[in-house]
């Protein structure tokens, strides 16, 4: 009897072989050659390129990004030969999507674009002009989730699966509330405008507000419902974050009328995290993604801190993955690296790259998130979907 290897869907995402008893496929995860994430380089001149590049800034070669191999390939007439197969540019390339798809991909869309459930109408050219920036942040999020080994079940595969509604309050005149409900993350494209987003950040007293930050926060709500699969896990979560069954609407009213409690800095990562246990989990999850994503980038570039310069016994060498490391190693590396990044930002006249403190209770919460992520099972899609509706909680909306 022959063994079946990993299968590749038309959008370029590899799934595990079907379970021998059920015939069902496991949730999707990236596979890299030799288990190492390749560096983004132009295949022609070998210069480093940004993940969102459509052309090489050095040699001007047209590029397409292959999700499975995590590499750029040269594109000619919208096609590239990859591992002996013909791949095509995503049909959303006009909105700056540089990912590649197989010929049979639904509507010619890549895996990341398939996750977008709603977007502005085609005649809303102003809003669509802002879509590219948000989609870029979303692709970066999807790449990181795959690198962490987290299951991604699309909204069009199962009810409660992950999806995105990317709408615009500026062009429609209707209010768009950023939030999460039953797997669907809603974002306001108006926040891709720097002046609009910065005005909101100042008005709300937030030290950090970006589209990627919104995505990482809202996906934290999604994964709380996915990764906490039994009552024991929920009990452990409640011991750290509080009881999520408390009234969410009452919490909103209390937070916006009274603000965060005095001394919140000793137990929470942000003022918003104090509002409700749902938000504390999502904020902590977002910071876990901030930390691991930044350290992985530093590792990929080759940035490290010399021991002698920093009065340490050993160099600080960030890792691309902390899956096999205790959270204490992750946070120790981050303590040192974040201080260095903050100094670099200040040298350019900017605010701190990471303007947050991590008190002991927050570190314990991050340890809980780390354990959840590093032990996330690649469960079958149906099992993940069944776990979502009962624990999805209320719609989480933030202003």
Feature map (PLM): residue ranges:
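Short Cys/His-rich micro-motifs in 6-15 aa windows
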Residues: 60-70, 113-122
């Amino acid at each position: 009897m022959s063994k079946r290897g990993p299968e590749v869907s038309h959008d370029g995402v590899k799934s595990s072989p079907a379970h021998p008893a059920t015939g069902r496929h496991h949730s999707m995860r990236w596979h890299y050659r030799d288990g190492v994430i390749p560096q983004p380089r132009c295949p022609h001149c070998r210069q480093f390129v940004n993940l969102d590049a459509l052309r090489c800034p050095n040699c001007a070669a047209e590029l397409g990004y292959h999700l499975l191999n995590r590499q750029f390939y040269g594109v000619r007439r919208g096609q590239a030969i990859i591992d002996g197969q013909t791949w095509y540019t995503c049909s959303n390339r006009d909105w700056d999507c540089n990912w590649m798809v197989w010929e049979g991909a639904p509507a010619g869309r890549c895996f990341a674009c398939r996750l977008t459930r709603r977007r502005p109408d085609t005649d809303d050219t102003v809003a669509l002009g802002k879509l590219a920036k948000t989609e870029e942040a979303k692709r970066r999020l999807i790449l990181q989730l795959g690198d962490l080994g987290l299951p991604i079940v699309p909204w069009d595969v199962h009810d409660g699966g992950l999806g995105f509604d990317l709408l615009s309050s500026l062009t429609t005149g209707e209010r768009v509330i950023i939030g999460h409900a039953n797997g669907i993350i809603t974002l306001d494209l108006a926040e891709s405008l720097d002046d609009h987003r910065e005005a909101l950040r100042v008005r709300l007293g937030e030290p950090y507000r970006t589209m990627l930050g919104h995505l990482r926060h809202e996906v934290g709500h999604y994964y709380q419902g996915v990764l906490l699969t039994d009552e024991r896990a929920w009990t452990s979560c409640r011991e750290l974050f509080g009881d999520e069954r408390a009234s969410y609407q009452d919490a909103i009213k209390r937070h916006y009328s009274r603000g965060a409690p005095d001394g919140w800095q000793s137990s929470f990562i942000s003022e918003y995290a104090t509002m409700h246990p749902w938000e504390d989990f999502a904020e902590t999850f977002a910071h876990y993604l901030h930390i691991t994503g930044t350290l992985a980038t530093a590792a990929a570039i080759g940035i490290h801190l010399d021991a002698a310069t920093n009065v340490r016994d050993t160099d600080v060498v960030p890792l691309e993955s902390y899956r096999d490391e205790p959270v204490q190693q992750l946070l120790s590396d981050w303590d040192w690296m974040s201080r260095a990044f903050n100094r670099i930002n200040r040298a350019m006249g900017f605010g701190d790259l990471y303007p947050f403190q991590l008190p002991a209770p927050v570190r314990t919460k991050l340890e809980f998130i780390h354990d959840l992520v590093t032990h996330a099972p690649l469960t079958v899609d149906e099992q993940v979907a069944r776990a979502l509706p009962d624990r999805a909680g209320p719609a989480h909306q933030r202003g």
